[in-house]
Amino acid sequence: MISTMIPSRGLIEEAFPGFAVSALVAATAQFLSDHYGAPAMLLALLLGLALNFLAEDGTRTAPGIAFTARTVLRLGVALLGARISAGMLAALGPGAIALVVAGVVLTILFALAASRLVGRGWRFALLTGGSVAICGASAAMAIAAVLPRYEKSERDLVFTVLSVTVLSTVAMVLYPMLAGLFGFTARDSGVFLGGTIHDVAQVVGAGFSIGPETGETATLVKLIRVSMLAPVVLCFSLAIRARGLADADGGKAPPLLPGFVIGFLALAGLNSLGLIPQGVSDFAGQVSRWALLIAIAAVGIKTSLGKMLEVGTGAIALILAETVFLAVFVTAGLHLLG
């Protein structure tokens, strides 16, 4: 029995320095966010990029940073399920739900089609399209966890997280003005904001800047998009296995049903049945947020800024096009439903 515990202790000892550094970066980012208003995810990423030397081979922190960027990330995604329940769907009505679901699916399909025009592969299309369509940085990290590894995996993930976070912040300021320009009601404004802005925090900020009804509706719509994370990640995983794309590219085939997806679905199911008390759900949400913040700090530390800048204008154009496509689609859908 003692022998079986030694590897676990060894893993903890090996991973702790890198995890501690990542947690410190995340805490610093949260402090700056609380005092200056910038998104914590963006700050954690930028601070992490400045500490890339800590992830170099041979450093004591490198193993823990790699562990945090992968395992802690998956824990954060799994715990998101505690915030999801089937009761959310009944509150919106079938028309709005159909619009939100269609927006997610069509944005991902648009990304796959548009990526060919800018010379980007299917991995990059799924990564950016899924992050724009679902829930920004959290979706990007979840999708990256099931995509086959390749030479530019970390660079593309950091670019995607950075881009969707910046675009979310811009949208938080711009989209409420567009909702007024389009003449949307408070409810429709909430559907528009929740259905188009990438990250949850910016959705909340944009929604409540208009009013309580808009803020509550926007948050609800956003959580419905978040609830699509597990099905979308599962579909990606199944498609990759079925087509043999991972083996063809020399990568490691992802599992049929990743453990963090099972965790997400299990928690969502328990919450839907009312088996998770509100206090526990709120606590799980906070743990999830911190796990993702620490993980994105680790991802930033692992990534070379110089290599990230090699991503090119085509990638920037693609993620902008995906963002515009989703906004136009939801706007058109609201006008048709209205």
From Swiss-Prot:
Record keywords, A-Z: Cell membrane, Membrane, Transmembrane, Transmembrane helix
DNA-binding is among the record's keywords: no
Localization, UniProt: Cell membrane
Membrane spanning stretches: 36-55, 75-92, 96-118, 125-147, 162-184, 223-245, 255-277, 290-309, 314-336
Coiled coil: none
Cellular component GO terms, alphabetical: plasma membrane
Domain of life: Bacteria
Primary residence: membrane
Topology in the lipid bilayer: Multi-pass membrane protein
Keyword Transmembrane helix appears in the UniProt entry: yes
Stated family: Belongs to the UPF0324 family.
Protein's recorded name: UPF0324 membrane protein TauZ
